[in-house]
Amino acid sequence: MQNSPIPSPWQFIKENIPLLMVALVLALLLRFFVAEPRYIPSDSMLPTLEQGDRLVVEKVSYHFHPPQVGDIIVFHPPELLQVQGYDLGQAFIKRVIALPGQTVEVNNGIVYRDGQPLQEEYILEPPQYNLPAVRVPDGQVFVMGDNRNNSNDSHVWGFLPQQNIIGHALFRFFPASRWGQLGSFTFVPARTIINT
């Protein structure tokens, strides 16, 4: 029995160039059109997302339906932030609070949507600012960070054009101790307590 020589790494690559090219093209297509990894650089989404978390952001679903209230989205900065020096290629991550046609107001530490107070169990602390009622225009959304008092979001720079949305943050893959699906939060209006 005769042993065939072990091919060198260069010979292996040369023989498998077509396969490697197909794999590279598929990887690039997945990254640009289907899903991509993202790194969380700030604390604006505490306690939901921590600085250093790594997420999978899917890019397909919003081509078929608009974002929903409660979705955590990744997006390019709106025009006002670009004027202030943020690069168009930079990415932000926030939670969708209101959709086109809905109103948003912040008063005495409570966020209201369409006049109803929201019960937001996922926020770090109640907002320490007020925002007069504003109606979200067509083609835009209102977004806020879960760390209400440390977030550069719609309460500062206004509405986010839906065309700026990169995708929906679905899954945290790092760190392993916080591994899992992010999902969307279903907003429940706060109960009104009537003293009798």
UniProtKB/Swiss-Prot annotation:
The chain crosses the membrane at residues 17-35. It is an enzyme of class 3 (hydrolase). GO terms for biological process: signal peptide processing. SUPFAM superfamilies: LexA/Signal peptidase. It is found in: Cell membrane. The active site is at 44, 94. Its main location: membrane. GO terms for cellular component: plasma membrane. It holds the Pfam family Peptidase_S26. Residues 1-16 are cytoplasmic. GO terms for molecular function: serine-type endopeptidase activity. It catalyses: Cleavage of hydrophobic, N-terminal signal or leader sequences from secreted and periplasmic proteins. Belongs to the peptidase S26 family. This is Probable signal peptidase I-1. It comes from Synechocystis sp. (strain ATCC 27184 / PCC 6803 / Kazusa).
